[in-house]
Amino acid sequence: YIRHNAKEKGIADFYIAQRVGSILEEPNQRGLAHFLEHMAFNGSKNFKNTPSSPSIVHWCEAHGIKFGTNLNAYTSVDETVYNVSSVPVKHESTIDSTLLILHDWSHYLDLDDKEIDKERGVIHEEWRTRRAGMASQRLMEEALPIVYRGTKYEDCLPIGKMEIVDNF
């Protein structure tokens, strides 16, 4: 969708929402949808993270788009959403490159073994901080198997199982 926004002239937000999430994982894949979302920032067809081809994160930060704030994504039970927000759109090339990022996210991720191994630690830290600092996360881990007993929803938290994240 394209929607006019008169409040912030010269700025645009870009999203790609996919109807895929942890509910589509098999039990031996718990956490892989979320892991793939993380890998979207570690290299793609057109953003390689090499001296001649900056990574998505480096390209965005060079254009004033902050990783984690204006460049982010999330995976839920039934969707994965990527966004690049507050993009300065004075130049057509910036719009083109941002659309190329969305294109790469939907089709052309690089899944380099070294990057995968590095990302395992990032996922572990996210899991640890959510469990340590968020009672709601621990409550969901306890409640979902009871509330959704007998359905696919009883065991499909997007963060997944760390033993699967470690060993796929």
Q: Model features per residue range: what roles?
A:
Residues 122-147:
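Short acidic/His-enriched helical or mixed secondary-structure segments at domain edges of catalytic enzymes
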Residues 1-13:
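Mature N-terminal segment immediately following signal peptide/propeptide cleavage
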Residues 36, 98-102, 143:
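Short alpha-helical scaffolding segments that buttress acidic/His motifs in well-ordered protein cores
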Residues 43-46, 84-119:
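M16/insulysin-pitrilysin zinc metalloprotease superfamily fold
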Residues 51, 68-73, 110-116, 135-136:
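Surface-exposed patches in mature extracellular/periplasmic domains of secreted proteins
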Residues 35, 92, 125-127:
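Exposed, low-complexity coil/turn segments of extracytoplasmic
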Residues 52-58, 110-128:
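Acidic/histidine-enriched alpha-helical segments
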Residues 10-85, 148, 154-167:
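M16/MPP (pitrilysin/insulinase) zinc-metallopeptidase core fold and M16-derived inactive scaffolds
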